From Swiss-Prot:
Belongs to the class-I pyridoxal-phosphate-dependent aminotransferase family. Induction: Expression is regulated by the cluster-specific regulator verZ. The keyword Lyase applies. Disruption phenotype: Dicreases the production of 11'-deoxyverticillin A. It catalyses: an alpha-(gamma-L-glutamyl)-L-amino acid = 5-oxo-L-proline + an L-alpha-amino acid. This is Gamma-glutamyl cyclotransferase verK. The gene is verK. It is an enzyme of class 4 (lyase). It comes from Clonostachys rogersoniana. Keywords: Lyase. Signal peptide: none annotated. Pathway: Mycotoxin biosynthesis. CDD domains: GGCT_like.
């Protein structure tokens, strides 16, 4: 681990008595997913984590959910660039974008339990930057907690249709709140 990523304990007894920021980059970007888990964010911000990218490296269910999402740090402590190569084409891997939810201690714990933290995920701390209305990061980082694969699969798997609908739905929406 580097200075941009730090492991955290996920046990209920170690969760502080104050609200904590959680970085959602998959289904937790959608407000209805949070409601289904009976988690009510105190505040929500659209953010980026420029040191990490979204990857699909957790074994899933063949055909219906081939891989689950996780985060991985860019090379060189989060400062390196990374390209996907397919035959002769190259595509730059973009930094992780998602939402930061400010959660009460009880909601934070509930979210960790429903996500499988401690089983397939480790809880890590990373630095996030809120995005302004023009889609640019505001230069005031803050700490968020998020989940990362405990045992990443290599090579990475394929995202499911469910993830693709989430990502494309968010991209086609003019704001997160409409989505």
């Amino acid at each position: 681990m580097t200075n941009t990523e730090r492991s955290s304990s996920w046990k209920a007894s170690s969760i502080p008595d104050q609200p904590m920021w959680y970085f959602g980059y998959g289904s937790n970007m959608k407000a209805s997913s949070m409601a289904d888990r009976k988690v009510t964010p105190l505040s929500t911000k659209i953010v980026t984590v420029p040191t990490h990218f979204v990857t699909f490296d957790i074994f899933g269910i063949p055909y219906s959910e081939p891989s689950y999402a996780s985060l991985e740090q860019f090379p060189d402590g989060g400062t390196g660039k990374l390209d996907l190569v397919h035959h002769i084409s190259r595509t730059q891997v973009l930094p992780a974008c998602g939402v930061a939810h400010l959660l009460s201690p009880n909601d934070f714990h509930r979210l960790l339990v429903t996500e499988g933290s401690g089983v397939v995920y480790n809880l890590v701390e990373v630095q996030a930057y809120e995005m302004n209305k023009d889609g640019q990061p505001i230069p005031a980082p803050f700490t968020v907690h998020t989940l990362k694969a405990k045992w990443p699969q290599r090579p990475n798997g394929t995202p499911s249709a469910r993830y693709m609908v989430r990502f494309l739905g968010l991209l086609s929406s003019s704001t997160y709140y409409q989505y």
